[in-house]
């Protein structure tokens, strides 16, 4: 499994909708870039200026909404993930 460093998290991105509300099937080029996903791994935390480490506010298993064009897309063992900094996460959904 991927283990992110510092204040980074690994997210399994939730797929974009395949159809519109009226039932029209969308081609890949017309789909919105997904902005939500499930956190599968978190780093150890961010290092503050005084040298102490602050743990992340998010945890494995959280479903989050993140900035549209943030992070780095990676494929690991056949699964697509997004690695991004905690500051790119906008909200945790409950």
UniProtKB/Swiss-Prot annotation:
PROSITE patterns hit by this protein: CHAPERONINS_CPN10
Known role: Together with the chaperonin GroEL, plays an essential role in assisting protein folding. The GroEL-GroES system forms a nano-cage that allows encapsulation of the non-native substrate proteins and provides a physical environment optimized to promote and accelerate protein folding. GroES binds to the apical surface of the GroEL ring, thereby capping the opening of the GroEL channel.
A Pfam family annotated for this UniProt entry: Cpn10
Keyword Lipid metabolism part of the UniProt annotation: no
Gene Ontology annotations of biological process type: chaperone cofactor-dependent protein refolding
InterPro entries: Chaperonin_GroES (IPR020818), Chaperonin_GroES_sf (IPR037124), Chaprnonin_Cpn10_CS (IPR018369), GroES-like_sf (IPR011032)
Keywords: Chaperone, Cytoplasm
HAMAP family to which the protein is assigned, alphabetical: CH10 (MF_00580)
Subunit structure comment from the entry: Heptamer of 7 subunits arranged in a ring. Interacts with the chaperonin GroEL.
PANTHER family on file: 10 KDA HEAT SHOCK PROTEIN, CO-CHAPERONIN GROES
A Gene Ontology term for the protein's cellular component: cytoplasm
Disulfide bonds: none
Name of the gene: groES
Protein name per Swiss-Prot or TrEMBL: Co-chaperonin GroES
Similarity annotation: Belongs to the GroES chaperonin family.
Organism of origin: Listeria welshimeri serovar 6b (strain ATCC 35897 / DSM 20650 / CCUG 15529 / CIP 8149 / NCTC 11857 / SLCC 5334 / V8)
UniProt-annotated location(s): Cytoplasm
GO molecular function, one term: protein folding chaperone
Main location: cytoplasm
């Amino acid at each position: 499994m991927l283990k992110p460093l510092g204040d980074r998290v690994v997210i399994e991105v939730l797929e974009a909708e395949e159809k519109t509300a009226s039932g029209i099937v969308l081609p890949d080029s017309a789909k919105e870039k997904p902005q939500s996903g499930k956190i599968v791994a978190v780093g150890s935390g961010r290092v503050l200026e005084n040298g102490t480490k602050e743990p992340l506010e998010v945890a494995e298993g959280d479903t989050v909404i993140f900035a549209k064009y943030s992070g780095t897309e990676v494929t690991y063992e056949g699964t697509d993930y997004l690695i991004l900094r905690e500051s790119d996460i906008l909200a945790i959904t409950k």
